[in-house]
Amino acid sequence: MSKPVILTYEGLKKLEEELEYLKTVKRAEVAEKIKQARAFGDLSENSEYDEAKNEQAFIEGRIATLEAMLKNAKVIDEEDIKLDQVSIGCTVKVYDESYNEEVEYTIVGSAEADPMNNKISDESPIGKALLGKKVGDVVSVEVPAGIIKLKILEIRK
């Protein structure tokens, strides 16, 4: 049995939309590129054809990955998110003692992690350290830049 892919409802919708886009729009675009490249003649030295076939393989691989993820998806129901401790699906405001600043993180499954938008995986060092902790707790986390201390200020949906 495959490992469940933990997703928020928002993450599920994004993956479903990406899958639909790849299956409808991108597949058709690549098929047209392949058709045009074939019209150039000799396929043995046809870089346009090779590029289109590589793009097709990438898209088909991504489609297969998304289908597998969605098949094994376990969606976190917002009603099930408890605010007494940090869990997947909640947003946590922390005070970073190392950098003297407040930061907010949304804890998500690894499939929808987006660190640039402060959506961190439950499997990341910070995500692991925060899971199960309560408001007022202080955690030390080893990150590439060293060890940071985070004090949990607020937990919300």
UniProtKB/Swiss-Prot annotation:
* UniProt record, GO biological process: DNA-templated transcription elongation; regulation of DNA-templated transcription elongation
Q: Name one Pfam family in it.
A: GreA_GreB
What keywords sit in the KW lines? Coiled coil, DNA-binding, Transcription, Transcription regulation
Sections of the chain in a coiled coil: 12-74
A single GO molecular function, which one? Answer: RNA polymerase binding
| Family annotation (InterPro entries) | GreA/GreB_C_sf (IPR036953), TF_GreA/GreB_CS (IPR018151), Tscrpt_elong_fac_GreA (IPR006359), Tscrpt_elong_fac_GreA/B (IPR028624), Tscrpt_elong_fac_GreA/B_C (IPR001437), Tscrpt_elong_fac_GreA/B_fam (IPR023459), Tscrpt_elong_fac_GreA/B_N (IPR022691), Tscrpt_elong_fac_GreA/B_N_sf (IPR036805)
For whether the record's keyword set contains Lipoprotein, the answer is no
Q: Which domain of life is it from?
A: Bacteria
- Protein purpose: Necessary for efficient RNA polymerase transcription elongation past template-encoded arresting sites. The arresting sites in DNA have the property of trapping a certain fraction of elongating RNA polymerases that pass through, resulting in locked ternary complexes. Cleavage of the nascent transcript by cleavage factors such as GreA or GreB allows the resumption of elongation from the new 3'terminus. GreA releases sequences of 2 to 3 nucleotides.
Homology family: Belongs to the GreA/GreB family.
Q: What is this protein called?
A: Transcription elongation factor GreA
Q: Which organism is it from?
A: Thermoanaerobacter pseudethanolicus (strain ATCC 33223 / 39E) (Clostridium thermohydrosulfuricum)
Upper lineage is: Bacteria, Bacillati, Bacillota, Clostridia, Thermoanaerobacterales
- What would be the name of the gene that encodes this protein? greA
